[in-house]
Amino acid sequence: MNQKELNEIRRRFRLDKNNFSRIFGCYVNSNREVISWIDASLGLMRQEEQEMYLGLLKKTLSGTLGRNLIDIEFSTAQVADSDEHRLLQTLRQTECKDANARETLCRKIIESLNMGETNCLILLAADAYDVPYRGKDDELQADASGDVYKYFVCAICPVKTPTLELRYDTDENFFHPSSTGHIALAPELGFLFPAFDDRAANIYNALFYSKNVELIHEEVIDAVFRVEPPMSAVEQKNVFDTALADTLEKDCSYDVVQSVHEQLRGRIQEHKESRDPAPLELTVGDVGGILSESGVSEEKVESFRRECEKQYGENAALNPKNILGTGKFEITTPEVKITVAPENSYLIEARMIGGRRYLLIPADDGVEVNGVSVSIPNEEHN
């Protein structure tokens, strides 16, 4: 799925835009015991209650493609004949109304999910989207439908345990202790099935959501989809950093790493300005080309390519945002940490002065120390 397709489905989670009829699921305690099963009509709920349920489900389509939202790809054999794909198709085709299929999915999640001492709420809801035709001018034509996209979403939400708080009593004009009750929080993970690719159902893919890019709950991916869990965004960065340092060795200089980061950010900016809805992806060969342009020898570049193919797999598509990690340029020594906005990384230089290595930062105007404006003396004043 690309960003435009994702946004199109996200807009379905409005009261006037969807065909969600019921909310299904279950409430589970930390001992993996089902406290209650949920089967409720959305239409019979109060408006604010409907909006809250739809808001939780919509959160499973939030975040960044390739980081929080991860493509799950089924093999041809799985789609042809496998219990895991058959279960998802049953839920989709019955609009999640098959009680046995619902319980089977929920049990898979409950038995595999590691949520520590936290209770959780599992929600399921199905929708049928009459996909409007998109004209040559890229405008949607609501009166010209092309296809019906039937899908369901699953949200897995941690539940906050009750605490005592002082609450104002309007009758007594006083604050009294009162329990907050069990509160469903934003989902930690969830998924959409099937994917909405080329504005149509793609039963070979699902879109998996993880709020935490470091912890994608591989155990749930394995239990529900029976596929090799993809690398998390953090794992992708760690593998890249290690491959860069280990294969370049002494050639992994400050200038090389700075150049690589600047070129990757340049690719990201160009992609953003192009307004291409598809996520930006680079091959290992593309990154190797960036290393070559940064002055790395062909021998080291080839070594880097081999290591990346070994770790990521052949023909792997790398997300440059995952490789760069956080949106900052950070330099650390045992005693000092320097953090600048990525677009200003060029301001920092590595120099050898008097036999010692230094990192130089321009300090012309606006210098502060713990919030106090200070002046930097000119050399001739020393």
Regions found by a protein language model. Give the residues of each.
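Extended alpha-helical interaction scaffolds
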Residues: N2-E5
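C-terminal, beta-strand-rich globular interaction domains
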Residues: A278, V287-N382
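Long, hydrophobic alpha/beta structural blocks
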Residues: R11, K17, S21-G325
